[in-house]
Amino acid sequence: MSMVYINIFLAFILSLMGMLVYRSHLMSSLLCLEGMMLSLFVMMSVTILNNHLTLASMMPIVLLVFAACEAALGLSLLVMVSNTYGTDYVQNLNLLQC
Amino acid sequence: MNMFSSCMITALVILTLPIIMSSTKLYKNKLYPYYVKTATSYAFMISMIPTMMFIYSGQETIISNWHWMTIQTMKLSMSFKLDYFSMIFVPVALFVTWSIMEFSMWYMHSDPYINRFFKYLLLFLITMMVLVTANNMFQLFIGWEGVGIMSFLLIGWWYGRTDANTAALQAVLYNRIGDVGFIMTMAWFLLNLNTWDLQQIFITTNDNFNLPLLGLLLAATGKSAQFGLHPWLPSAMEGPTPVSALLHSSTMVVAGVFLLIRFHPLMEHNQTIQTLTLCLGAITTLFTAICALTQNDIKKIVAFSTSSQLGLMMVTIGINQPYLAFLHICTHAFFKAMLFMCSGSVIHSLNDEQDIRKMGGLFKVLPFTTTSLIIGSLALTGMPFLTGFYSKDLIIESANTSNTNAWALLITLVATSLTAAYSTRIMFFALLGQPRFSPMILINENNPLLINSIKRLLIGSVFAGYIISHSITPTTIPQMTMPHYLKMTALAVTTLGFILALELNLTTQGLKFNYPSNYFKFSSLLGYYPTIMHRLTPKTSLTISQKSASMLLDSIWLENTLPKSISYFQMKSSTLISNQKGLIKLYFLSFMLTMILSLLILNYHG
C-alpha cells in the first residue's frame, strides 16, 4: 500500500483509539468520532480520485451528510446529559434517577 | 250625546298625569306615592261610569283619535275600542292596582327610590290600558312591548342581586320568543288582509287562518307562560311583592289570554287551533300544579298557582268559551292579587322570610292576614259562592259537558284537585302549628295602608264574582242541564284534594325527611325543564366546539399523530428492551481490547 493510504489509515486508527479510550468527558469521544469521519472522508476521496472511480464520486458527499446527522444526534445526547447534571462527565451516566 | 267617550278618555288621561309631572318638583316630594294612588283611585271611579252605562244599555264605542300615517293602502291611526272586554276589564284592573299601590306604600316605604317605583307601576298600568283598549294590532303591540319592558324594569328592581338580573333577562327573552309569533301574525294580516284593524280582520273572509292563529298562540305562550315558555314566571318572583301581585298575577300575564280572547271570531271556526290551545293549556295547568306541590318559597307557590290558572284559561278558550275565560280573568285578578299581598304581609312581618318551612303559628299573631289568606285560597279553589266559583265551576261544567278531548279534560280535573292540595300546603305550613320563626321579631300588622288595601280586595274576593256575573250581558249560554255527578265534579275533586293534602300534612308532620324520591325531585326541580333548556344547550355547543376545534384539530392531528407518537413509541420500546447499565468506558475499552487481540492473534494466516 502506498504511504498516503497508510498515513490516513493511521489517522483513522488514532481517532478510533481516542474514542474508545477516554477518561471523563463525553465530549472528547464525540470529537474523536468527528476525526474518524474526517479521515474516512479523505481516504475515500483519494481512492476514488486516484483510481478514477467516477461513478462513486457521490459517496464522500453522502458520507458527509450522514456524519452531520450523527454529530447532531451525539451533540443532542450530550446536551441532554449536560442539562441534567451540569457537566458531561461520563460517570453521570448511571441508572440513578436523580 | 252622552259622556261615554269623554269619561273614558278622562280616566285614561288622569292616569298619565303623574308621569307628566315627574319632571317637576312634585316628583321629589315625599307625598308622590300618595298622589299616584289617589290618581289611580279617581281613574277607577271615573271609569266605573262608562262601565255602568255599558252594562245598562250595551253601548260600545270606538274612539279613533289621530291619524298617524298611511302606508300605501293601509291606514294607521290611534283608536280605542271600548267594547265588552275592555269596559269590564278596565275597572277591575284599576281597582286591583289601586289596592296594590296602597299596599306598596306600606311594603316599600323604606325604599329610597319609592317615587321611581310608583312611576314604573303607573307606566305599567298605562301600557296595560293601551293593550286592552287597542283597536288595531299596532297599538296592541305597543302595549304588549310596553308591559314587557316594564316587567323587566320592575323584576330587576333590586338590581344589585344577580338572581334578580337573571330573572329579568329571562322574562324579556321568553317574551321575545312569543313576540316572534305576534309579528308573524301582523305580517300575515298585512299581506293577506291589508289591515291591522280588528274590525276589518273579522269581516274579511279567508279559507284558512291557521298561520296567524298559530302566531297568536305562540305570542300567548310567551306572554302567559304556557308550557314551553314558562320558566320566567317563577323566576320573576325575584321582584318585590307588589310587582308580583300586579304584573304576574292579575294583569300582565293575562295579556296573552286576552289577545286570544280578542281574536275569538277567528278562532271559533278553526278546530285545529282550538285543539292545540286546549292541549297546551291542559299540559300547562297540570305541569305547573305538580311543580307547585314541592316548592318551599311562598311566592313561588303562588306564582305556579297563577301559571296553573292561566293554563285553565287557555283550556277555556280551547273549548270555545272566550267569555268564560274573560270572566275567569276578572275574578282571578281579585283573589290572586290578594294572595300575593297576604304573602307580602307575612314576609315583611317575619323580617323578609320567604321559606314556608320557617313560618308557622301565624294564625294567632296575624289574624287579619290569616283570614284573607284563607278566604283567598278558598276562592282560588272554587269554594261555592265565593268569587272563584262563578268562573271556575262554570268552566269545569262546560268542559265536562262538551265534546272535547277526554285526556285534556282529565288532566284539568287532576290539576283542579292539586290546586286544593298546594293551597292547603300554604295554609298548613304558614299559618297553623307551632311557630318556626325566630322569636326576636316584633310582628305588627296594624298599619291602615295594609289593612285597607287587603280589606278592599277581600270584599272583592267574596262578592265580585256574584256582582260581575249577574251584571254582565248574557253571552254564550251556559249548560243548564247535566247529570248530577258531572255537576258535582269540580266540588268533589277539590274536596278530595283538600282532604288528601290535610291528611298527608298532618301525618308526616313529625317524620324525618328521607332521601327524596324521583317524583319529588321531578316536582321540585320544576320538571327538569329549566335545567335542560338553560344549561344543556349552551353546554352542548361549548363542548362540541371544544372537542372539534381544540382537541380534534389542534391536539390530535397537528400535535400528537406524528411527532409525539413517534417519540413516545421510541421511548417506551427503548426502556422496554434495554437492560444496559450505561458503563460506556467499559464497553469501549473491551471493544478496543477485542480489536487489538484479534489483530494480534489472527495475524498469522497463511
Curated annotation (Swiss-Prot), chain A:
It catalyses: a ubiquinone + NADH + 5 H(+)(in) = a ubiquinol + NAD(+) + 4 H(+)(out). Belongs to the complex I subunit 4L family. It is found in: Mitochondrion inner membrane. It is a multi-pass membrane protein. The chain crosses the membrane at residues 1-21, 29-49, 61-81. It holds the Pfam family Oxidored_q2. Core subunit of respiratory chain NADH dehydrogenase (Complex I) which is composed of 45 different subunits. This is NADH-ubiquinone oxidoreductase chain 4L. The gene is MT-ND4L. Its main location: mitochondrion. GO terms for biological process: ATP synthesis coupled electron transport. GO terms for cellular component: mitochondrial inner membrane; respiratory chain complex I. Keywords: Electron transport, Membrane, Mitochondrion, Mitochondrion inner membrane, NAD, Respiratory chain, Translocase, Transmembrane, Transmembrane helix, Transport, Ubiquinone.
